Every structure is written in structure tokens, then in C-alpha cells.
Design a protein with these regions (language model features):
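An N-terminal RHG(E/S)-centered segment typical of histidine phosphatases
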Residues: 1-52, 65-72, 76, 206-215, ...
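Acidic, low-complexity terminal tails and accessory targeting/binding regions
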Residues: 2-4, 91-103, 107-113, 158-166, ...
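Beta-strand elements within well-structured catalytic alpha/beta cores of enzymes
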Residues: 5-9, 56, 163-172
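Active-site glycine-centered loops adjacent to acidic/histidine catalytic or metal-binding residues
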Residues: 11, 87, 173
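Phosphate-coordination/substrate-recognition cap region in phosphate-metabolizing enzymes
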Residues: 42-117
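Short glycine/proline- and acidic residue-enriched helix-loop micro-motifs
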Residues: 110-144
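A mid-sequence, solvent-exposed acidic-amphipathic segment
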Residues: 135-164
Length: 232
């Protein structure tokens, strides 16, 4: 049986990413820079000769748009199974969805916990803090949030393993991917870039993290695109 490996991609840069707004379950499309970055990623994955058996994304528009670009660059549009899973959505920021990042992460949360920076909080503390300050009642507590993220990625790995292993291409979100890594090895990655790749292996019911936030595929794709422009 082939190794079961998940390639977890953070979606391309969006309008809200660009102006510093918390996206969560709200959604904006990739902008021009974001689209180019994902074309770079798709080319980089193609140049690396990676083969994918299935594709999965959250049901958010920005991950669906990202996946479409990657599959196009890989020549896999309509060629491998691709479905959506709401369990691998981003965290829900409740009444702060669509608000400025600075207001939530550098204002409200530090005041609630009497800390200087939100990175001082564990994911569990951050989730419970969001529940506390969310006036809409939409934010998920840590048990619910971590449970649906674990279940979502586990379902992909189990499906792939049952099919004989191989690689899955998965497009999700920065904090969701970071949370999954934390649940595996209790390390907390910071600032996963748009279009970065985090690789997770699955064997005998256990996950191991092979790499986090790898930008080498995007960088390789960017080089190919630059060379194509120079030769025109």
C-alpha cells in the first residue's frame, strides 16, 4: 500500500486578507495577487511530479476557487474525485466575522485576557475567549471546534487509506490547518502564508507532520512563470 499523505494548502490571498479583516465563515474572493500565487503553487506541484488521488476543500468560496486553479494547472479538472467538507472550514469568529483583525486580535482578546499579544494564548483559550466576546452566539467552543476539524481531516485520511493510500490535495484555511497541526503534535504554527503547503502523513490510525507552511512549491512555480515571460 502506498503511503497516505495529505497536502494541506491554505487558500489564496483574498480581498479581506489584503485589507486585514477577519474572514472566518464570511467569504471574499481571491484578488489578482491571490490568483497569481495559486497559479504559482499549481505549477510548482506539477513540476514536482506529484500525483493526487483525490481532492477536498472546505465549502467556502475562497477554497473552492483556489482548488479550481490548482486542478487546472495540474490538468486534473474533472479527472479525480473532488468534494467539499464544511468540517474543514475556518474558525467562526462570530460577531467579529468581517471585522478588522486588529480589533479582535490586538484589541479585544488581549484586553479580555490581560495579555500583550494574542499569540500568548493557546488555541483552546482563544476559542473560549471568542465564545465569551461573541455577541451573536455563533463562535464554537474548543471542544466543538477541535472535534469537527479533527473529524474532517481524519475522514479524508481514512478514505484515502481505504482506497490504497496515495496523496490527497486538500485546500483549507490558516487557523484550521494550524489547529490540526496542534492537535497532532501540540506545536502551534504561526502565520501560515496563502498558498503554503503543510504535509501530514497517516499510518496505523496516527498522524505525523512532515512539514509546515512550505512555500517551495509556490517559489518554484513563480520561477517558471518568470522564465515564461522572459522567453516571450
Amino acid at each position: 500500500m502506498a503511503k497516505t499523505r495529505l497536502y494541506l494548502v491554505r487558500h489564496g490571498k483574498t480581498m479581506f486578507n489584503t485589507i486585514g479583516r477577519a474572514q472566518g465563515w464570511s467569504d471574499t474572493p481571491l484578488n489578482e495577487v491571490g490568483e497569481r500565487g495559486i497559479h504559482e503553487l499549481g505549477i510548482g506541484l506539477r513540476e514536482a511530479g506529484l500525483e493526487f488521488k483525490l481532492a477536498r476543500s472546505s465549502d467556502s468560496g475562497r477554497t473552492i476557487q483556489t482548488m479550481g486553479i490548482i486542478l487546472e494547472e495540474l490538468g486534473l479538472t474533472g479527472q479525480i474525485p473532488y468534494t467539499f467538507d464544511k468540517r474543514i472550514r475556518e474558525w467562526c469568529f462570530g460577531s467579529f466575522d468581517g471585522g478588522y483583525d486588529g480589533e479582535l486580535f490586538m484589541g479585544v482578546m488581549p484586553r479580555v485576557f490581560n495579555i500583550e499579544h494574542v499569540h500568548q494564548l493557546s488555541y483552546a483559550e482563544l476559542a473560549e475567549g471568542l465564545v465569551e466576546v461573541d455577541t451573536a452566539g455563533w463562535a464554537e467552543n474548543w471542544e466543538k471546534l477541535s472535534g469537527r476539524i479533527w473529524e474532517g481531516f481524519s475522514a479524508i485520511a481514512e478514505e484515502l487509506e481505504a482506497a490504497g493510500g496515495g496523496n490527497a490535495l486538500v485546500v483549507s484555511h490558516g487557523m484550521t490547518i494550524g489547529t490540526f497541526v496542534y492537535l497532532i503534535n501540540r506545536t502551534r504554527p504561526h502565520g501560515l502564508d496563502n498558498g503554503s503547503v503543510t504535509v501530514v502523513d497517516y499510518e496505523d490510525g496516527k498522524f505525523t507532520v512532515a512539514c509546515v507552511g512550505d512555500m517551495s512549491y509556490r517559489e518554484a512555480g513563480a520561477k517558471v512563470m518568470e522564465e515564461e515571460v522572459e522567453t516571450r
